[in-house]
Amino acid sequence: MKLGIVGLPNVGKSTIFNALTGGSAGAANYPFCTIEPNVGIVPVPDPRLDKLCEIYSPDKVTPAVIEFVDIAGLVKGASQGEGLGNKFLSHIREVDAIIHVVRCFNDGEIVHVSGEIGPARDIETINLELVLSDIDLVERRIDRCKKAAKGGDKKPLAEAALFERLNEWLGEGKSARNFPCTEEEKELIADCPLLSNKPVIYVANLSEADFAGDLNENPLYRQVLEIAEAEGSRVVPICGKIEEELSQMEPEDRQMFLEELGLHQSGLDRLVTAGYDLLGLISFLTAGKPEVRAWTITKGTKAPQAAGKIHTDFERGFIRAEVIAFDDMKACGTMAAAKAKGLVRSEGKEYVMKDGDIVNFLFNV
């Protein structure tokens, strides 16, 4: 699963990506300094692993990870090929969700492509380019449905009517993800790889001074928040400069710096966690002396399929899963104490995994 970082040029995308990944994507003061997308694998913050390490003192610790892609800055007219538009849009098509970085800071040394800071306008510019790209796809889908309906089949005719409604919606500059429709219609639309149908998190990139102030009183941040609330999306406020500094510190110094700022968690840790949730992902845990590990699965995954994430033999020969909730394990301190209290459950093939389940899979092949 991939999260694509998008935004206009010079909004801080590459600075944020570099802080996330410890990489060195181009972060120069001009458009298109990132042309081919940079890809980074980022660990998902999970304090539960720290607690399990206290209990087991493992030889190895492996967190869950998520993939971030830094996509070059979009510009107005990208859907018609302006800038390096078509190439950039194709990169966005390959990701599962969008991290939309919005500039909410003033800095005379960093040019803004529009000449002045305007978060609402910038969001509209990016969203409109995605919508315009989608209109072309939807119109082609309508044509195919109508051709298929000539044989008298009513199903493609109904599908054509749905996509005509969607086309009108897109024609008003509205994103497909906010299109009012039934669950069945959503599934049909999901078959069409629409850019504006991808879930989104808005990142409000603030100056150090504004980040330390009252965000509710910040007019630039409020512009982002109001748009996100209207479409049911999330906003993660961060300061790219602070995150860049944090990324270069040792863990102990980083924690001290966060405490000085009055923060429990960095903005980027909050972004990674929000992205994981946006993709519908959860983690189950395995724990022992050799390794403590978080495994990524989608919400709704059943126990045998979760076992298959570890090894295909675990799924093929699944017998049952011994499961304890993390909070119960934390309270007991050891697996032996948890078993003595009857907190370790035996679950079968229909068990739906929960976030934070600590599991031992029993299998036979």
Segment roles from a protein language model:
Residues M1-V111, E139-R140, R144-C145:
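Conserved G1/Walker A P-loop phosphate-binding module
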Residues K2-V6, V11, F17, R144-V352, ...:
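C-terminal-of-GTPase-core extension/linker across diverse P-loop GTPases
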Residues V6, F32, P37-G40, P47-L49, ...:
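Short capping/connector residues at structural and topological boundaries
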Residues S24-F32, V39-I41, L49, P58, ...:
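Generic secondary-structure boundary/loop-capping signal
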